[in-house]
């Protein structure tokens, strides 16, 4: 990815993880004018849950410093909601539904949050950047081929990312 591509506004960025550190990253990227989608597990565990977008998994939405993350149903739930059976047409219809739901949340100035622990949806969205902010001590499925730029945050992200950032907590960061 060239410097001009990185500098442009409105990049589509997927952040794997929505814990307290990931929330800070998401918040800053959103304020910089980028479209950010957060991916989280079914039962997230964050150190500081009251300042974490992962709370949206439990409450449907979470607001941190004026920015709201909104939980969207998983793709399978979208198929159930629309009453469509498991056919190729159903998959296309549910993907259109998912894209329109995500676009509606983004247009509202919020962050869509999807439950996708394996990152399967990343290939569907074809983001400009993937940020692995899961903060696990091992790789949980992120690969360098997921986007033109893949950034790892925390331990264990050296071999599968273009860039790596060390995490630090505190208000002087």
Predicted feature locations:
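Glycine-rich adenosine-cofactor-binding loop
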Residues: 14-23
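Gly/Ala-rich phosphate-binding loop of Rossmann-like dinucleotide-binding domains
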Residues: 30
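Short beta-strand "acidic-cap" motif of Rossmann-like dinucleotide-binding folds
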Residues: 36-40
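N-terminal beta-loop-helix "entrance" segment that forms/cooperates
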Residues: 44-65
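A structured beta-alpha segment of the ubiquitous adenosine-cofactor-binding alpha/beta core
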Residues: 68-125
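N-terminal glycine-rich phosphate/adenylate-binding segment common to multiple enzyme folds
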Residues: 114-154
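Conserved small/polar residues in nucleotide/adenosyl-binding loops
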Residues: 161-168
